[in-house]
Amino acid sequence: MEGGLDTDASVHNNPLLQLDYEPAFASLGDDYYDLVAAAPFPEHRLRFRGDGVLRLLGLDPATVGEEHFIEAFGRFAGRGPFLAMRYHGYQFGEYNPYLGDGRGFLYGQVRGLDGELYDFGTKGSGTTPYSRGGDGRLTLKGGVREVLASEALHHLGVRTSRSLSLIETGEALWRGDEPSPTRSAVLVRTSRSHVRFGTFERLHHFKRKDLIQKLLDYVIAVYYPHYGAEPERYALFYRELVGRTAELAAQWMAVGFTHAVLNTDNMSITAESFDYGPYAFIDRFDPGFTAAYFDHYGRYSYGNQPLVCRINLEALQLPLSMVIPIADLEAGLAIFDTHYAAHYTARMLAKLGFGALGPVLGPELVKATLNYLEAAQAGYHGFFQALAASFDRSWQSDQGAIPAPVVGAPEAFELWRESYFRALASLSDSELLRVGERLNRHNPTTVLLRPAIEAVWAAIDQNDDWQPFYDLIGRLRKPYAIA
């Protein structure tokens, strides 16, 4: 296990409790949250610890033992009460005014060595006023899945929350969508913010312009401080959020990730991927792939994600328009498509081995690649892995030497091969030398596909064997052939 377990660690002078917690969100006042306590749990077994996050927070992992984690993030001793954040949201296009932190809370906020303020948020820590009849708990499998998602995405270069700890809590839970009874856990994750689009939507629902402006001032001061007292800071904030969200959508699409539940309450005001439920990485390239069994109409399908992000940003205009002129909001949203296209094209070209190829050649190659993948019903990651494994510089002078990375769709393959050859032919000798390196640097050899997750869970569920879980995490942290 990462960092090892020190069962003799003293709970005195707990480094996790001695962090310099800042009352940033708490200082806004109780119009934005409810004070809650953590649930008591019968058992505490540390199953995962995020030593990389500890280092970001300025802690030496060797000084933080198992009992420190259990005391701080299992028993929740030494701090409290905690903040259950209030928000609403559009869920599958329908407005839901009955949301809020239903099984978690804001534990605290700590500034990292990078100068950014990080929220510690919990999942499975007990009931709150927003539990809506639920038990406030997290299944152990759900916790395992979230740890794996955040580790995978972080090391693929996607802006994401990080898992700080996963503690099994010894309760039997009943769920309608998985075999029950099932085991329980509590997760602590770090995120740059847990303020959601839905946080603003709730305030608009109650017609509280004053609270929207107060929250805007907080968000800009804490997360967009470069705008300072700029008279146009509100409009500039929204424009930057649009650009960041477009980039996040491009990151998801390039790595083949389907979030599955892109409701506005799952959209972060810092454009960070978080709250991992029925997510999946695509295997076969299929824009219509849906990861959630309850997404009957494919609203949050893999291919719809950029559009949904744009729709959610447009929905955010309604509450923000109480403070920001609608013309400024519309101008901000107008950059989404070009920002998304630029970031997505750049990432896909890198996966194909190229840097910038120009405004025509680059997009044409990406389009030909996607057409080929879809026509061949090819494995998305396997295609790029095969391309990386077979690449040869001689292809630049011999189009016929370029082999098919996947089987099927011969007509689409010929169109792709012609486009790939034109791209290679445009390169200088020095640029050609970098193609193979880029192919290996940008195409992971380890991808978090569903069979890998299920194999890890089967070992835990049937034999309480955690080694496959830790082994998979190790591979996810080094996903590329070239670091």
UniProtKB/Swiss-Prot annotation:
Keywords: ATP-binding, Magnesium, Manganese, Metal-binding, Nucleotide-binding, Nucleotidyltransferase, Transferase. Mg(2+) binds at residues 266, 275. It catalyses: L-seryl-[protein] + ATP = 3-O-(5'-adenylyl)-L-seryl-[protein] + diphosphate; L-threonyl-[protein] + ATP = 3-O-(5'-adenylyl)-L-threonyl-[protein] + diphosphate; L-tyrosyl-[protein] + ATP = O-(5'-adenylyl)-L-tyrosyl-[protein] + diphosphate; L-histidyl-[protein] + UTP = N(tele)-(5'-uridylyl)-L-histidyl-[protein] + diphosphate. InterPro entries: SelO. ATP binds at residues 100, 102-103, 123, 135-136, 189, 196, 275. Its EC number is 2.7.7.-, 2.7.7.108. Its cofactor is Mg(2+); Mn(2+). It comes from the Bacteria. The keyword DNA damage does not apply. The active site is at residue 265. Pfam families: SelO. It is an enzyme of class 2 (transferase). GO terms for molecular function: AMPylase activity; ATP binding; magnesium ion binding. The keyword ATP-binding applies. Belongs to the SELO family. Nucleotidyltransferase involved in the post-translational modification of proteins. It can catalyze the addition of adenosine monophosphate (AMP) or uridine monophosphate (UMP) to a protein, resulting in modifications known as AMPylation and UMPylation. This is Protein nucleotidyltransferase YdiU. It comes from Gloeobacter violaceus (strain ATCC 29082 / PCC 7421). The lineage of its organism: Bacteria, Bacillati, Cyanobacteriota, Cyanophyceae, Gloeobacterales. The gene is ydiU.
